[in-house]
Every structure is written in C-alpha cells, then in structure tokens.
C-alpha cells in the first residue's frame, strides 16, 4: 500500500512541476546568417540555446585582435 501511494505521489509530482524548458520562449535559432542548429558545435562556434528538435543553436565565435603587444 505504501509503495502504491509512493508511485502515485511521484506521478502527481511529475505532472505538477513545470518542464525545464519554457514553451513561451522562442526555441528557434535567429534567422541571421551565423546561427545554425546542429547536434554538436564546430571548434569556431559556441552554443547559444536549444532548438525545437533538441539540437543546439550554434553561433560563430567573434575573436577581436587588439593590435600587437609591445615589449
């Protein structure tokens, strides 16, 4: 009987707790040219968010060079 109550308690808790990902937020990658939905980002990219199909939205890393160092 206790096991049955435990199972029902766990099931009710699973259905009352909201999911980690909000359905209100935008799950799509922005339509700019440097965003891509992939399963793994390349070495020159970093992850931004999850896409609708649970792939990762990747963006190119912007590396700025601030001139040469002087000794």
From Swiss-Prot:
Q: Which GO terms describe its cellular component?
A: extracellular space
**Biological process according to GO:** defense response to bacterium; innate immune response
Alphabetic keyword roster = Antibiotic, Antimicrobial, Defensin, Disulfide bond, Secreted, Signal
Places the protein is found: Secreted
Secreted as UniProt keyword = yes
Q: List the disulfide bonds.
A: 29-57, 37-51, 41-58
Q: Which domain of life is it from?
A: Eukaryota
The positions making up the signal sequence are 1-22
> Which PANTHER family does the record cross-reference, listed alphabetically?
BETA-DEFENSIN 131A
Family to which the UniProt record says this protein belongs? Belongs to the beta-defensin family.
User: What role does this protein play?
Assistant: Has antibacterial activity. Upon stimulation with lipoteichoic acid, promotes cytokines and chemokines production and secretion.
Tell me what this protein is called. Beta-defensin 131A
Q: Which organism is it from?
A: Pan troglodytes (Chimpanzee)
Source species taxonomy: Eukaryota, Metazoa, Chordata, Craniata, Vertebrata
């Amino acid at each position: 009987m206790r096991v049955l109550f435990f199972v029902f308690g766990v099931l009710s808790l699973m259905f009352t707790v909201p999911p980690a990902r909000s359905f209100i937020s935008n799950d799509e990658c922005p339509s700019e040219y440097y965003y891509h939905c992939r399963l793994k980002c390349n070495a020159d990219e970093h992850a931004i968010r999850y896409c609708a199909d649970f792939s990762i939205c990747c963006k190119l890393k912007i590396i700025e060079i601030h001139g040469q160092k002087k000794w």
